[in-house]
Amino acid sequence: MNKILAAWAWNGPVSEPIAYGEGHINQMYALTEQATQKRYILQKINTDTFKDPDGLMENICGVTDFLREKAKQRGADPERATLHVALTKAGKPYYKAADGGCWRVYDFVENTVCLQQVQSSEDFYQSAVAFGNFQHQLADYPANTLHETIPHFHDTPKRFADFQRAVAEDRMGRAAQVQREIEFVRAREADYHVMVDLLTAGKLPLRVTHNDTKLNNILFDKTTGEGLCVIDLDTVMPGLAANDFGDSIRFGANHCAEDESDLSKVNFSMELFEIYTKGFLQAAGEAFTPLEKQTLPWGAKLMTMECGMRFLADYLEGDHYFHINYETQNLNRARTQFKLTADMEKSWDVMQKIIEKYC
């Protein structure tokens, strides 16, 4: 570890790195400069997931530099408005160790907290404002210059093709027992092309998207409760704004566990949908085209279906991607997503009216 730390020009000795945070993808540590008491985050990039660390860090540096300039222009604190990458002595955004491990350092954003679950509707609203502001501030960033850090990440037609292959191969002999779920996915095949076709036709613009818009990817100000800074930028890529909106809705607009086995407890919350829509569009609305706003419900439905079919495909393939604690966990996860989708379909007109209300 000392050889790794020596790649940065610290202001004197630093403390021993201590494991920090609850992330599952990258190893993360906190450390402190002893002379200044300034804290930093040291992360090892998971190059199994992110195979192009150069492209990954080029994305992150480009976007965070841009966000800092925007913060200065509006009179906000640029060091709290976004992450700040500490460059190595060689002027690089990460260090490649002798064993091939790739490490990076961020300034620690003080007086902030990361929430793992929605504790109040205000938390969900503040997360919407934070992600909406992320879209607003990056509206004029050239999205086509970003690297695709995980190819086809939110390519729903490709996810469906992968699902179909998992069903056909049926490696674990489980398909016969989940025909109802398989047919639920197949019955919505036409839906999976809606957003991609609009993008291909030039009717929807390519945006800078976060692609993992969960509550725990925001730093909240401990004093004010404000959603301050969007973090975990590894999946920042070109994409559709509706997908970022939709992933938040999928994750947050319900009160159930992700693997709830009692589907009577799984309900899509229109109240939380409206709270999030209000915050998201208040922060980002003027940056979006009318059609982008109209298609936000499609983002919610497609991100939920995409996640559900990925859970079901993993169940059919032997649970090799998503970690499980019991045999049917991925199946329960899939059923939960499908129940949320069915609820959205029943409330489609109401969802559209809520979008119109805040346009």
Q: How would you name each of these model-derived features?
A:
Residues M344-S347:
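Long, compositionally biased intrinsically disordered regions
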Residues I18-E22, Q43-K44, F50-D54, V109-Y125, ...:
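ATP-dependent phospho-/nucleotidyl transfer catalytic cores
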Residues P17-Y20, H24-D162, G239-A241, G252, ...:
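Conserved ATP-binding subdomain of kinase catalytic cores across diverse folds
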Residues G202, N216-A257:
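Catalytic activation segment of kinase domains across protein kinase-like and atypical kinase folds
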Residues A242-E286, L302-Y321:
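Active-site activation/catalytic loop segments of kinase-like enzymes and analogous catalytic loops
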Residues F288-A300:
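All-alpha amphipathic helical-bundle segments outside canonical DNA-binding/catalytic cores
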